[in-house]
Structure formats: C-alpha cells, structure tokens
Design a protein with these regions (language model features):
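Flexible, surface-exposed loop regions and adjacent strand-edge segments
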Residues: 230-234
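Cofactor-pocket helix-loop regions in the catalytic cores of large enzyme subunits
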Residues: 1-220, 228, 242-245
Length: 245
C-alpha cells in the first residue's frame, strides 16, 4: 500500500465503475463558477486548510455551501485568512450556509432519499441522461419507492430536511461535491460514492464548467500517481505497454 490507495481507494473503484475514470473531474477554478458546493464527510479546516480559501472565494462568486458531516467544524463556521490583515482583525467569514448533522455512515441513506426526491419530482436532465448515461430506467424503478422511516433512522436526517435540500440541488445550475475520509473509510463506501455520483448524473452536473466530482486528496501527488498508472495492482495493459517499449 502507498499514499494512492490508503485513503481514496474506494473513490477510485466507485468513479472508475460509474464514469470511467478513477479521479476527480473538476479544476480549482471550477469552484468560482459553481452555484452549489456540497462538502460531505470532510473537515477542510482541519485536514485541508488551504481549501478554505477556495471555498471562501467561491462564496464571493455566489456559491452556496452545504456541509454534510456529523462534526460541526469551526473552520466551516468562521474563517480568517491568515494572509489578510483585515480578516485577521475581524470576526471571520462564514463558509458553510447550512450544516446537515448526519449520522456516521448515514450518507448512503441520505443521498438515496435525495435522489428519490429528484426523480419523484422529475427534476432531472433527461437530455444529458439519454446522451451520456445508461441504465436510467432500472435506476429510476429502484428508487421510485423508498422506506422513509429507514432513511431517517440511518441518516439521522428528517424527510422534510432531505426534501428541502433536494429542492436546493434541483434549482442549482452547477454543483460540485467534495468528500474525504468520512465517506471513503466505510465497508459500503463504494456504493455511497456511486449514489453521490448519481446525484450529479441526474442533473448533468459533470463534465462542464463549475460542476463535477471532487474527492479531496491528502497526500502529495496522489492524483499524479493514478494518472501515470501507479497502483499496487498494476493494470495489465500498462505492464504490457512498458514491456513493449
């Protein structure tokens, strides 16, 4: 094992299976074009402090930010940029517009309920789905009926709040979802991440400016590792091409 598979191995499997590439789909500049940013199972102030600057700048450009996390992190409530004297003298800038205090590993149930609401209210991009996805009818049938008692119990979030957030998601023109160890370190992490991906695929929030998926890495050059094929289980085609060369 190395830094490329200790943390986001589940992200790599989930994304490769769902969208054909095992890494994020956004650039840093996309944050300034997003209308909604979901920060799920991640504590930027503690583990990715420089990301707070990107989130603050995104808010300046009009983005709404929803934090979905059992922990209410101070950095998401107030942020003072250490290189800005005026901010250091002030009370700080609010980062998160809304905090959803979910149960530990309640994310799958939460996004399942969220996607149910989106499908039920027909708030999906049928053109994008038809051109860029497969299996929609089967997925739609599987999610048209959900057990709300179970979703509320597992997620710790009320049906009313999930429906409220689904409405925000449906009204947003471009969405970025970020996640880290709070998502990836569970036995069902792959399924949870794929349900998050489904939220993006339903609305066409991928492959365009200001929208996409952002697994937030922690170690240096993990993204680069995967780009050049470094893995503890090497891709056979990579090995063959190296041998051929």
């Amino acid at each position: 094992p190395d830094c490329s598979n200790m943390c986001h191995e589940s992200s790599g499997f989930a994304l490769s299976d769902s969208i054909g590439i095992g890494k994020g789909t956004v650039k840093l500049e996309d944050f300034n074009s997003a209308s909604l940013i979901l920060v799920v199972g991640q504590n930027p102030g503690t583990n990715h402090p420089r990301m707070l600057t990107a989130l603050r700048d995104a808010k300046k450009h009009g983005a709404s930010i929803i934090s979905i996390n059992p922990l209410i992190e101070t950095g998401m409530k107030k942020f003072k940029h250490p290189q800005n004297p005026l901010e250091m003298l002030g009370s700080g800038k609010s980062i998160s517009d809304r905090h959803v205090r979910i149960n530990i590993n309640g994310d799958m149930a939460f996004f399942r309920g969220l996607n149910h609401c989106i499908v039920k209210n027909h708030n999906y991009d049928l053109n994008f789905i038809g051109e860029h996805t497969s299996g929609f009818e089967d997925y739609k049938a599987s999610i048209e009926s959900v057990d709300w008692d179970q979703i509320e119990s597992i997620s710790g979030i009320s049906r009313q709040e999930i429906e409220s957030i689904a409405e925000i998601v449906s009204e947003s023109k471009s969405i970025i979802t970020c996640w880290a160890m709070g998502i990836t370190q569970h036995h069902n992490s792959v399924e949870t991440i794929q349900e998050m991906v489904n939220t993006h695929l339903l609305g066409g929030h991928i492959g365009r400016k200001g929208a996409g998926l952002c697994p937030v890495r922690g170690h240096s050059n993990v993204q680069g590792d995967r780009t050049v094929g470094i893995n503890h289980i090497a891709n056979p085609s990579l090995i063959q091409n190296i041998q051929n060369s």
